[in-house]
């Protein structure tokens, strides 16, 4: 949450792009008390059927909704399909493998072991 809080403090827009349905994502972000931190949540219900990750549609929809150019966006992803979707959308991707995907070859434009390994300032300086 430090990265999200820092992004919001700098006036940056923050969204979730998920291949899961809104019913799942909205429920869990509300349960965790983080729903209000996001400007938008884009899910499988927001794109054409069969166009979730690794297709770029979720990220393209997020860029359109946020009114952000792909050259000014960053995606944080934990899965190979998500990294591929981000790259296909032309967005810089930071891969942060989770315990399940750590054994897979999840390689973003930048790959880090955890969000704690990178500050927003470090990212903005790249």
Question: Across the structure, where does each feature detected by a protein language model lie?
Answer:
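Short, acidic loop-to-helix structural element flanking the phosphoryl-transfer center
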Residues: 1-16, 22-26
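Asp-based, Mg2+/Mn2+-dependent phosphohydrolase catalytic module
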Residues: 5, 22, 27-126
